[in-house]
């Protein structure tokens, strides 16, 4: 990418994107902001997303009064993220919609908006870093290990990274808060949340029943089966459980029982003791490689199976069906189909894939 001069920054109304905007202005870029509206008019007929102009006052200082556009991507969000989310739960998997949203909605929407206004790069307030070396754009962890969001960006392409700036990558959250004060940022400090934005009150059961009215009749009253294959109870619907879950099973046992597998075809939940959650191996599909070419033979990498998981040495082997086999040196707990395994070399994100099964 040539040196950018006109940057389109995605803003959310929070401190992070506001500070990212101010930093870009301070660095001398011509900056325009866009608010991606993801949850508006979900039932409206499809229309090509169009930019609606406005203005943004990031702080009281006139240097930070910049052009603002809004882009309604609610239909795209519904089609690409919400339908994926629903389908994954129906298939007995536990999805991660933020990863899909980043690639399919946010980056795609920002790049589309940038083309419409003539910006030659986009920026976000994510805590991650990007660089170019050895003929390839590379993605790295953010400086703040507690806020690092690189795990959620493994689906980005070379073309995405080529047109992306990440102004907060070298900063910690306390430093961002201090900059917000110095800039006089008006944005509110949003409460940290791990909730899915379209699932009210983090109530997955109510959301799924509303999104798929036929679900209750289809999945209710299935069997809960122990490690010996004995039916020990009934469940209220396999989509309402996840691998590793202990609470809310409604069965009693001498030792705690955990969900070890979801069988959508048989409408069964398998449970076992905690040791049954441990496994060394998984299969993954729909892989995306950023920092390396897709492996043609076995390669030693570091892998994580969830956001707060620690990196563990693993051997990644490509299979003939397009999947990869991942074997960890140390066992992982509760490998969950539908979640992502993300690979690193130190702080660099090399790529990832969606987990199909753990064994």
Swiss-Prot record:
UniProtKB keywords: ATP-binding, Cytoplasm, Disulfide bond, Nucleotide-binding, RNA-binding, Transferase, tRNA processing, tRNA-binding
Enzyme class: transferase
Residues the UniProt record annotates as site (Interaction with tRNA): 126, 339
Function: Catalyzes the 2-thiolation of uridine at the wobble position (U34) of tRNA, leading to the formation of s(2)U34.
GO molecular function, one term: ATP binding
Protein's name in the database: tRNA-specific 2-thiouridylase MnmA
Residues where ATP binds: 10-17, 36, 125
Region (Interaction with tRNA): 147-149, 306-307
Cellular component terms (Gene Ontology): cytoplasm
Annotated GO biological process: tRNA wobble position uridine thiolation
Family of this protein: Belongs to the MnmA/TRMU family.
UniProt-annotated location(s): Cytoplasm
InterPro entries: MnmA-like (IPR004506), MnmA-like_C (IPR046885), MnmA-like_central (IPR046884), MnmA-like_central_sf (IPR023382), Rossmann-like_a/b/a_fold (IPR014729)
Annotated disulfide bonds: 101-197
